[in-house]
Every structure is written in C-alpha cells, then in structure tokens.
Amino acid sequence: MKDINLIEVEKLIGIEFENKGVLITALTHSSYANQFKDVKYNERLEFLGDSVLQLCVTKYLFNNYKDKSEGELTKIRALVVCENSLHKVSKNLSLGKYIRMSKGEELTGGRERTSIQADALEAVIAAVYLDKGIEVANDFILRNFKDVIDKAINEEIILDFKTRLQEVLQKNGEVNIVYNLVKHEGPPHRRKFFTDLLINNEIMGQGVGFSKKESEQNAAKAALQRLGEIKWEKDTI
C-alpha cells in the first residue's frame, strides 16, 4: 500500500498533528506491521483510545442528562461506544481508505471490516489525545459522536445485542445464558471466532466474527432474530 496521505486525513478529522508519526501508527493495522520490521501498529493506541472515549462520553452524559439514572446512563454509553457505533463513525470519516494493512488483509475485505475500522478510530482518538490533549480529543469525540449519542438517547438504535437479549429473556424469568467459543481459525491477524449461544442448555444462536466480542454479538443477534425481537437481515453486526 502507498504511504498515507496525511494532509487528506488531517482535513477529514479536522486536526493538524505536530507528531505525524502517532497518526501514522494509529492507521497501521497489525497485518501491515507483520510484513515490515520495526513498524509500529495501532493496538496499544486502541487500548488508550478506548479509555479516552469512555471518559469523554461519560462526562458528556453526566453533565447533560441529569434526569437519567446511573443504569440509564450506563446503557446509553454502551450503545455509543460499542464496536458498531465506532464503525459507523469511522465510515463517516472515511478512515478505512487510509488504514495501512497487508495485501492479503485487504483482499479479504479488511478495509471494510467492522473491527478494523472501529479499532482504527479508537487509535486515532488516542493519537489526538497524545498530540493535542484531552480538550481537543473531547471536542473531536463530541463532534463526531453527537449523532450517535442523540440516537442512543432517543432509543433509536439497539447496538448491544447481548444486553438486549438479556433484557428480553429476563422478562420471562430467570434464564441461563452461556456464550461458548466453539473454535477459531486463520492466522493471528485475520482470525475468525465461532460462538454458540446457549439458553437453558439449548443452542439459540450462532455467530462468527473477527473478535470474540463480535462473534458473541452476532450470536446474540441471531438469537434475537429467532425469538422475533428483530428482523432477519443478511448483514451481521
């Protein structure tokens, strides 16, 4: 892949970086780093960005929705920061176009993959925080997540299928929900996870994803579809 056009990326996210290297790292997938020695990739930045995102969203919700209980705020935050929401924001910013990855990863659809785009966005958030500080990072997050926050507040989106399934089942009494990782296959940078969801020892949903979290969400989604709680779709989370 060609070098990242940093000028384009900075225009898209609305921030000019002092340290260009941290932005490049944020947009580098592990599969790319596996091909070249001494190339940093975005996994550690993703870890930091997740915490920065959680903090900024939590502070915003706490300050602006004083009528909401702790439980309600927790549920709203979960919707805002979940992988699917991150993917939507990442797509809006066209980050997928600029992620450095191996040719093999790209040929298997990596550029459009939910987990890769979501991870890259978290890494970019960390890069903004490290380069510009918490205030600029907070502004960046609120500017790009405002629509997601509004939809979560208005209950227009259900993104956390595991939580939704638990709520549906608890209405009918106590149930035993188990997510069983059946297998995983593929190389480390392109590994697929397969999960069975058991409700009272009966398989009610099966999910596949490029992370354990994604496969569990897809299994929960399949169970909700089977129970008639959401419509059947071809696309997974």
From Swiss-Prot:
Catalytic class of the enzyme: hydrolase
Record localization: Cytoplasm
Q: List the CDD domains hit by this protein, alphabetically.
A: DSRM_RNAse_III_family, RIBOc
**Any idea what job this protein has?**
Digests double-stranded RNA. Involved in the processing of primary rRNA transcript to yield the immediate precursors to the large and small rRNAs (23S and 16S). Processes some mRNAs, and tRNAs when they are encoded in the rRNA operon. Processes pre-crRNA and tracrRNA of type II CRISPR loci if present in the organism.
Classify the source by domain of life: Bacteria
SUPFAM superfamilies membership: dsRNA-binding domain-like (SSF54768), RNase III domain-like (SSF69065)
User: HAMAP family from the entry?
Assistant: RNase_III (MF_00104)
Entry similarity comment: Belongs to the ribonuclease III family.
| Domain spans labelled RNase III | 6-133
Q: What is this protein called?
A: Ribonuclease 3
Q: Name one GO molecular function term.
A: rRNA binding
Q: How does it assemble?
A: Homodimer.
Q: Which cofactor does it need?
A: Mg(2+)
Species for this entry: Clostridium perfringens (strain 13 / Type A)
Q: Name one GO cellular component term.
A: cytoplasm
User: What EC number is given for this enzyme?
Assistant: 3.1.26.3
Record-level GO BP terms? mRNA processing; regulation of gene expression; rRNA processing; tRNA processing
Which is one Pfam family of this protein? dsrm
The record's listing under SMART domains reads: DSRM (SM00358), RIBOc (SM00535)
Which catalysed reactions does the entry list for this protein? Endonucleolytic cleavage to 5'-phosphomonoester
